């Protein structure tokens, strides 16, 4: 579990208003909000939406926690010519660094790795080169927040119906765990653990498309992540 200096209380954006009191009483100062950003692909976007919804229904006293989700369908770290997540995270860190960043990709990355021009830099057939390049992209994503005080939470994906996608996203979770091991500001979480589905079978947690999570499993994972943040 991970912690930030705040009590878990959720508001739908903005700080809590100061409460009124009897004349002459000391004013109540609204606690400073804690900003959480969930970033990644459509799976991350679904989780971020569930976290935001769960947060809005949370308790009403203490430090407000505001959840923001930024996601791009069909993206990951494989194709910076399509969407450059490390670059986007560096922009976020420079402009609006949150207290907590939840980053989750992997299920769109069962493919060769390209550079920003679309040229292939590592094929899936060359396992060593692919792993080395993917580790570097994970490291750049994590290190974007090294000087901001942001707590980075890597979130691994569950295994979907497609075997190749499942083997790849579980392998990516292993790579992320390795990269995070020597970074004190990076926490590793796993949807397979948060939902209780396990790393090998996810039939009860998949939606009808065989890739995304069901609403109930998104909600379960969101609740546990928010509890960890609190």
PLM regions and their residue ranges:
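Sec-dependent N-terminal signal peptides
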Residues: 1-9
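C-terminal motif of bacterial Sec signal peptides marking the signal peptidase cleavage site
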Residues: 14-17
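Bacterial signal peptide processing site
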Residues: 19-22
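Conserved SGNH/GDSL esterase-like catalytic core that processes O-acyl groups on lipids
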Residues: 29-129
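Extracellular/periplasmic catalytic domains that process cell-envelope and extracellular macromolecules
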Residues: 30, 93-97, 147, 181-182, ...
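Generic structural signal for well-ordered alpha-helices
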Residues: 89-90, 135-142, 173
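Active-site segments of SGNH/GDSL-like serine hydrolases
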Residues: 107-108, 141-171
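Catalytic His-Asp segment of secreted/periplasmic serine-dependent ester chemistry enzymes
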Residues: 158-230
């Amino acid at each position: 579990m991970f912690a930030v200096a705040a009590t878990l209380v959720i508001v739908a954006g903005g700080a809590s208003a100061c409460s009124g009191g009897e004349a002459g009483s000391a004013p109540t100062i609204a606690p400073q909000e804690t900003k959480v950003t969930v970033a990644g692909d459509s799976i991350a976007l679904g989780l971020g939406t569930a976290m935001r919804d769960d947060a809005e229904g949370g308790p009403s006293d203490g430090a407000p926690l505001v959840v923001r989700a930024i996601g791009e369908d069909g993206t990951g770290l494989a194709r910076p010519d399509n969407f450059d997540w490390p670059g986007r995270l560096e922009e976020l860190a420079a402009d609006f660094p949150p207290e907590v960043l939840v980053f989750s990709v992997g299920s769109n990355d069962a493919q060769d790795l390209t550079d920003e021009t679309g040229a292939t830099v590592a094929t899936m057939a060359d396992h060593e080169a692919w792993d080395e390049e993917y580790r570097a992209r994970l490291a750049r994503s994590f290190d974007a927040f090294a000087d901001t005080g942001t707590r980075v939470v890597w979130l691994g994906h569950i295994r979907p119906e497609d075997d190749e996608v499942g083997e790849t996203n579980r392998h990516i979770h292993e790579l992320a765990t390795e990269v995070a091991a020597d970074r004190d500001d990076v926490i590793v979480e796993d949807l397979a653990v948060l939902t209780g589905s396990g790393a090998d079978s996810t039939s009860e947690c998949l939606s009808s498309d065989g890739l995304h999570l069901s609403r109930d499993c998104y909600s379960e994972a969101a609740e546990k992540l928010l509890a960890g943040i609190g």
